[in-house]
Every structure is written in C-alpha cells, then in structure tokens.
Amino acid sequence: MTIGKILLYYCFTPIEDPTAIMLWQRSLCEKLGLKGRILISEHGINGTVGGDMDACKRYVRETREYPGFKKMEFKWSEGGAEDFPRLSVKVRDEIVAFGAPGELKVDENGVIGGGVHLKPEEVNKLVEERGEEVVFFDGRNAMEAEIGKFKNAVVPDVRTTHDFIAELESGKYDWMKDKPVVSYCTGGIRCEILSALMKNRGFNEVYQIDGGIVRYGEKYGNDGLWEGSMYVFDKRMHHEFGQGLEDPGFIQLGHCVHCGKGTNTFHNCINEDTCRKQVLICDDCIQHVETQHCGRPDCAEVAASQAQA
C-alpha cells in the first residue's frame, strides 16, 4: 500500500526564463504522477503538490537540482494526489497576486526589504518580552481566520490578496506603525511580500514567522499562541495541530452560520449566479437544501426555491 503526502513550498529567487521552468516542472510532475498547483514568475516559484511519498521525495531531489532552488524548504503534510482535482503549472506576473509586481524586488537570498524572520520560539520570546505591545497581523483572506488565528490577532477585512494594498493605505492600521508587528500566513509566502509592502508604507518594526502557521503549529501544537484550525487550499479544507479536534488545548473558533454548531468546514453558497461565497456550514445543515446558503436574504430565497423544486 502506497503512502501519500502533500508538499508545500516556495522560493523567491530571480528566474530569467519562467516559461522554461514551467515546462520542466510540468513534465516532472506528470512523470511522477503528482497533482496540485504551481505558479512561476520572474520572482520565483510557489507550489503545493501531492502524490505518492516516494514520488514526492524524488520531486524534491530533482527540483533542488535547479541552482536557484537548491536551498528551498519543503513542508510535508498528510494527504496525496487525490486531494487535488488536477495538475496546474502556470507562469504569472506574481507568484502571490498582491497586484504589485513592480514593487517586489528579489535576489538570490529572497525578498529584498521584507520583515525580520522569527522562528516559532522567537515569536513566543518576543511576546514574553514586550507583551501586549506586540500585534499579530493576519496576512490571509479574512475568511481563513474564521476557523483559526493567533490570539488577539488583527484580521484585515480582505477577500483576496489584491485587497491588501488598499487596506494598508486606508489609514486603519496607522496605529500599528510604531509597534512590533508579527505578520503571519499559512506557510510564510504571503508574508514575505506583505511584510515588504508594510515596510514600504511606514510600518517600522515588522516581523514574519519563519515557515508560517505550519511551522508554529508543528512546534507548539495547541499549547502556544495559535488558536483553532488552519485553512488549507485543497480538499481537506482545514488542518489541526497536536492531537487534532480531540486535543485538550484545541479551541473551536469556527461555527455554522445557521445553527451555531462548531465546524471547520466551508461550503459554497448555493446561489451560483451572484454569490458562491464560502461559508461555514455544519454537517447537519449542509444535508438540507434550505440551509445551503450564506445567510444573505436573496441567497436564502434561492435555497428555499430549490428546496421546493
């Protein structure tokens, strides 16, 4: 019986010919039977792929043969190719779509001018030394924080990474500009860019967590500053640390929009024409068509009409 694994990785490094790297990566993944999503730009590579563990090991070895990716870190998690609908390898202007390709600068050491990297234990030390002065700033989409975030974190009202620049320039967060700000995201890639954007806009003391929530959760489980589940962009939808949902230290943050029952599972609103918003709906409520909506009155009407059909 084969064992499946999922790889999460990124690397910021100058790439002269992104198309050539794209073709090589696509061929490599097809040869190894991997599925997932890989984005490549002149700034680097960003990928999540899944497949047989031996195939994943070979993928890591062969990908690191490219000089710019030699030191790239790969994060391993449970899962496999079945967690992805297909293989997608594409060239983009940005490997994370903040809408600022001209602002991002990279060299062989990574992003130029980004926030200071902190290991998980250094994050805890910073909080111990400076207490409530420290601000955790969520670098993900606001929806992701509904099921998990750092304790007392500031969660910007953004639906996509494209919204961050306008949000930072809105003045809402000027009170943070002279405070120690710890930016965080799933695996660290979004905060590589976000922390640089923040520094460019006058935030004076910006940090980022090395390896993101993934590494912090692996280190501390449910006994640190992280609360709840981590949203993931594959069929699993969410990931728990430590002993999972049964861990004595686990804090349930996500709740069904209809009945309030604890849940970490997102579903698309039934109103496919004008909504499709992802919302938390528990296993019981999702069984009934009339509660397969986001809660908006017009979406509730769509659900009700389909239930009667």
UniProtKB/Swiss-Prot annotation:
It catalyses: uridine(34) in tRNA + AH2 + O2 = 5-hydroxyuridine(34) in tRNA + A + H2O. Residues 130-225 form the Rhodanese domain. Keywords: Oxidoreductase, tRNA processing. Disulfide bonds: none annotated. One of its GO terms (molecular function) is oxidoreductase activity, acting on paired donors, with incorporation or reduction of molecular oxygen. Its EC number is 1.14.-.-. InterPro entries: Rhodanese-like_dom, Rhodanese-like_dom_sf, Rhodanese_C, TrhO, TRHO_N. Pfam families: Rhodanese, Rhodanese_C, UPF0176_N. The active site is at residue 185. One of its GO terms (biological process) is tRNA modification. PANTHER family: THIOSULFATE SULFURTRANSFERASE/RHODANESE-LIKE DOMAIN-CONTAINING PROTEIN 2 (PTHR43268), THIOSULFATE SULFURTRANSFERASE_RHODANESE-LIKE DOMAIN-CONTAINING PROTEIN 2 (PTHR43268:SF6). Belongs to the TrhO family. Catalyzes oxygen-dependent 5-hydroxyuridine (ho5U) modification at position 34 in tRNAs. This is tRNA uridine(34) hydroxylase.
